[in-house]
Design a protein with these regions (language model features):
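Short His-Asn-centered micro-motif
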Residues: 89, 108, 124, 160-163
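Active-site metal-binding core of divalent-cation-utilizing nuclease and nuclease-like domains
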Residues: 20-37, 56-61, 84-116
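Active-site-adjacent loop/helix micro-motif of nuclease/hydrolase catalytic cores
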Residues: 84, 97-100, 114-119, 128-142
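Short loop/turn motifs at secondary-structure junctions
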Residues: 82, 102, 117-118, 153-157
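Nucleic-acid nuclease catalytic cores
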Residues: 87, 129-184
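Short secondary-structure junctions
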Residues: 76-85
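Charged, often low-complexity linker/regulatory segments
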Residues: 1-75, 180-222
Length: 222
């Protein structure tokens, strides 16, 4: 598990460097003209100003999951995603009981004042028991990810993500579910009414049923 005790080693492995005369570690992303920083003195995770953070509790050392979110954002920036297209802790009201849910990471395909198109939603967990429990729940009933998907029906992917630090290496798992109907399955549905599609599902429960019955609970990897 990534934690406060090994976090500096993780950062060093990821290419962060310690600023002279301080306990701040930093890494720049020239192609995106932004940087990530970690302030160990104040125990703060500092994200680019262009990136939207809805809940500042994700920016402290208080929860081990925050380190996973930070590592995942680093991976996204490394892959070239724009910081202004990333949001942390986006909140929705879920279900009839008006309970709220917060997605760890949302990445947009388009994000302007006129138009916002979600690309994918990521739920982050610490490696080991927490991740294994979340995956079990995901397979059994869809968990929170399917509720988020229902709120953002335009999203193309949802994923369950965990990262770890083992034997001096940063490792990760990323269980990805496509939210788009397969073209061949759509053709089958035209001939067979028993084949159900995501586009005809109206609730998180129905989305899960389609994933289970039509797509056999298929995961993708990146």
């Amino acid at each position: 598990m990534i934690n406060k005790g090994n976090f500096q080693s993780v950062l060093s492995k990821l290419g962060f460097t310690k600023k002279k005369g301080s306990n701040v570690w930093s890494k720049s992303f020239p192609s995106r003209k932004c940087k990530l920083e970690v302030d160990f003195e104040h125990e703060r995770l500092v994200y680019p100003k262009e990136l939207t953070v809805y809940d500042e509790t994700t920016s402290n050392f208080g929860h081990p999951e925050n380190f996973v979110v930070f590592e995942c954002v680093h991976r996204l920036l490394e892959k070239g995603y724009r910081p202004e297209h990333i949001e942390l802790e986006k909140r929705w009201t879920l279900g009839h009981e008006q309970k709220s849910g917060k997605a760890d990471i949302c990445v947009y395909k388009t994000k302007t004042d006129e138009e916002q198109k979600m690309l994918f939603i990521i739920e982050c967990k610490t490696a080991g028991r927490e991740y294994q429990g979340a995956k079990k729940t995901l397979i059994e009933d869809g968990g929170q990810l399917f509720s988020y998907w229902q709120q953002e029906r335009g999203t193309e992917w949802v994923s369950l993500y965990a990262s770890d630090f083992v034997d001096g290496k940063v490792t990760y798992v990323n269980d990805i579910i496509s939210c788009l109907d397969d073209k061949n399955v759509e053709l089958m549905a035209k001939k067979d009414s028993s084949v159900h599609l995501y586009k005809n599902a109206h609730t998180a429960v129905e989305l899960f049923e389609v994933w289970s019955e039509t797509y056999a609970k298929q995961f993708h990897s990146n």
